[in-house]
Structure formats: C-alpha cells, structure tokens
C-alpha cells in the first residue's frame, strides 16, 4: 500500500518538479526550471506537492490575482501575483507519466481546493486542453470560454470554480 503525503514545495523540490513537468507536458508548454523556482519562492502556499512513499509524483502550482486574465503570459512568472488576492490561477496540474492512472490528479485537486478554501480564496481558475474539460467539470469547475492564449502553440479552454463562502 502506498503512503501519500501532501505538502507545500520547498526550493529543493524545483529540479524534480521540472523533470515531471518536462516529461508530462508537450512541446513548449512546460514551465522552465527558472519559472518553477520563481513559483516556489514567491508563493509556496500555492505550490502543492504530492509524494508517494517519499517520492514526488505530482504537483499543482498557482498564483493569485485581483483581476484574472487567463491569457496573460507574464503572470506565469508571477508578474502581478498578490498572495492576498482572492482569485487563484492554476498554472500546472501535473503527475509524473510513470504514476498516472492512479487518481493522483484528482487527489491533488481535492487537497488543493481544501487548502485554497481554508485560505479564504473566492475562485480557482485554470486553462486546460479540450480533452480535459469534462474531467475538470466532474471536479466542480465550470466551463468559461475558449482561451485567447496559444501557450505552447496549443488551444486552451478556461475553467473556473467558485469556492464555498465566496
């Protein structure tokens, strides 16, 4: 039986997270090591790690904004991020391909939503590919619109979840 543990990211996790991101995402959509280091350094509360038996198998990272513009590429480097802002913007939900199919992304998202609710956030926003829209709808997200973003040269769709008490 595996031992799952959630925790916030530490600077020493950046290289492993970059390995997972580079392996799981296609083309130019993976964040650089520098972006991952920035996200850990500036908003560790929004960078959730999932470990299985002490080994990092996945993570979610995010930033917060007062006004959400999902196509804002600069925000991926946390330009405009404000930890006290009410709206969370997820930049990556990623599980090591060798560990996919075990329900880890759903477990990560449930824990992430609980943590953001505890921080009194109002909404969580994300962009996903068309094939993931129904997955996020099952997790409680609402479809917003096709995104004007062409991050990584791909088509994206914007989703949002309103959190309890918002």
Feature map (PLM): residue ranges:
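Conserved catalytic-core motifs of GNAT/GCN5-like acyltransferases
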Residues: 64-67, 125-127, 137, 142-158
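Conserved G/P- and acidic residue-centered "switch" motifs that form tight phosphate/ATP-binding loops
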Residues: 103
């Amino acid at each position: 039986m595996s031992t799952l543990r959630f925790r916030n990211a530490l600077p020493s996790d950046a290289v492993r997270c970059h390995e997972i991101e580079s392996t799981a995402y296609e083309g130019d959509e993976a964040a650089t090591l520098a972006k991952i280091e920035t996200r850990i350094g500036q908003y560790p509360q929004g960078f959730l790690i999932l470990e299985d038996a002490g080994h990092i198998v996945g993570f979610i990272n995010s930033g917060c904004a007062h006004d959400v513009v999902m196509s804002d590429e600069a925000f991926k480097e946390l330009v405009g991020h404000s930890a006290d802002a009410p709206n969370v913007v997820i930049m990556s939900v990623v599980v090591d391909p060798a560990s996919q199919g075990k329900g880890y992304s759903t477990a990560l998202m449930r824990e992430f939503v609980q943590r953001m609710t505890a921080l009194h956030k109002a909404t969580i926003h994300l962009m996903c590919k068309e094939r993931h829209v129904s997955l996020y709808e099952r997790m409680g997200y609402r479809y917003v619109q096709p995104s004007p973003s062409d991050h990584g040269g791909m088509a994206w769709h914007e989703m949002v979840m309103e959190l309890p008490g918002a």
